[in-house]
Amino acid sequence: MTQKIIIFDTTLRDGEQSLKMSLSVKKKLKIAFALEKLGVDVIEAGFPISSPGDFESVKKISERIKDAKICSLARCIDGDIDIAAKAMKKANSFRIHIFLGTSALHVQSKLKKTFDQIIDMMVSSVKRAQKYTDDVEFSCEDAGRTSLDDLCRIIELAIDLGVKTINIPDTVGYTIPYEFSNIISSIYKKVPNIDKAIISVHCHDDLGMAVANSISAIQVGARQIEGTITGVGERAGNAALEEILMAIKIRKDILNFKTNIKYQEIYSTCRVISSICNIPVPVNKAIIGSNAFSHSSGIHQDGILKDKKTYEIIVPESIGFVSQPLNLTSRSGRAAVKYRMKKIGYKDSDYNIDILYSRFLKLADKKGRVSDSDLKQLVCFNNKLKNLKD
């Protein structure tokens, strides 16, 4: 049976942490509307205690968004939880997301606590959050470097308290896929009440493993993925949701999952967020880069002209991307030149392909990319020479 993966977007919270300046309420609302249109299940709208501006943004988003659950982050501090609930009180549906460091490094060096004290803080904060909603998510910060015994202990207690979602973050992007999937598998084996909660994952990209780690986690039981559009996020960024979503869609033979995502909105959503956040999309970015569906090799262009599936595993239009003409460069073959000539209105009898292609290569070597206008001029020049000879 195909199982659903919950898509939890944290572009407005974790993603914004990568920006040099805070986004205005108006810009955050625009992003939230784009995410709602995309079809994400949960929008983590912000961290309300962090600033009056963030509180106002979460409040406005909670009032306006109707088709996605709104979530706010809070530390295991009563004041944080109270403010998070206050910001979301007009939401159709909301979740309070509390987090606490669980690795020895975080417990001892950052929090200056014992693990028993961490347990007590979690218990108190879960109960506090449950005064406002029965939808509470608990994150074991730095789970990737937390001992398995400690991790399973705190997870079991949180689920006993009624926590519905347990998030396993690879906070500093430390793990590799085999290791991260083993953590998730071990949680399922060692936590007796695990069937009463959803396991979520939240991966960072410090070693370039965020997407791979997220995919490896759902293969062994995780049912919520947290990430950001374009992978924007603190340091090296978060798991890029568009990459995860397309992996699920394209590799259904291995990843037998479904989501609520409207795939045709992926490209426009990414471009909207890139523009608002003023973060350019690299040309070779998977799924949404300007080169993602371009082909310059003559062999590849010939294959594409015969059957696009030879070199494209994604139909560009399926994500809302309008296919671009083949780029004609010195690497292009005769087939690509003939195809382009036909597209701009020429018949094979209008020109000699051998002569045209020879001149095309010389021009391409000089200027790089050859345009439709260039091709027309080459034909015109060739015809003039022919007339002179005649």
UniProtKB/Swiss-Prot annotation:
One of its GO terms (biological process) is L-leucine biosynthetic process. NCBIfam families: leuA_bact (TIGR00973), PRK00915.1-3 (NF002086). Mn(2+) binds at residues 14, 202, 204, 238. Residues 5-267 form the Pyruvate carboxyltransferase domain. It catalyses: 3-methyl-2-oxobutanoate + acetyl-CoA + H2O = (2S)-2-isopropylmalate + CoA + H(+). Its cofactor is Mn(2+). This is Putative 2-isopropylmalate synthase. The lineage of its organism: Bacteria, Pseudomonadati, Pseudomonadota, Gammaproteobacteria, Enterobacterales. It is an enzyme of class 2 (transferase). Belongs to the alpha-IPM synthase/homocitrate synthase family. LeuA type 1 subfamily. Its EC number is 2.3.3.13. Pathway: Amino-acid biosynthesis; L-leucine biosynthesis; L-leucine from 3-methyl-2-oxobutanoate: step 1/4. GO terms for cellular component: cytosol. Keywords: Amino-acid biosynthesis, Branched-chain amino acid biosynthesis, Cytoplasm, Leucine biosynthesis, Manganese, Metal-binding, Transferase. Disulfide bonds: none annotated. GO terms for molecular function: 2-isopropylmalate synthase activity; metal ion binding. Homodimer. Catalyzes the condensation of the acetyl group of acetyl-CoA with 3-methyl-2-oxobutanoate (2-ketoisovalerate) to form 3-carboxy-3-hydroxy-4-methylpentanoate (2-isopropylmalate). Pfam families: HCS_D2, HMGL-like. Gene3D superfamilies: 1.10.238.260, Aldolase class I. PANTHER family: 2-ISOPROPYLMALATE SYNTHASE 1, CHLOROPLASTIC-RELATED, HOMOCITRATE SYNTHASE-RELATED. PROSITE patterns: AIPM_HOMOCIT_SYNTH_1, AIPM_HOMOCIT_SYNTH_2, PYR_CT. It is found in: Cytoplasm.
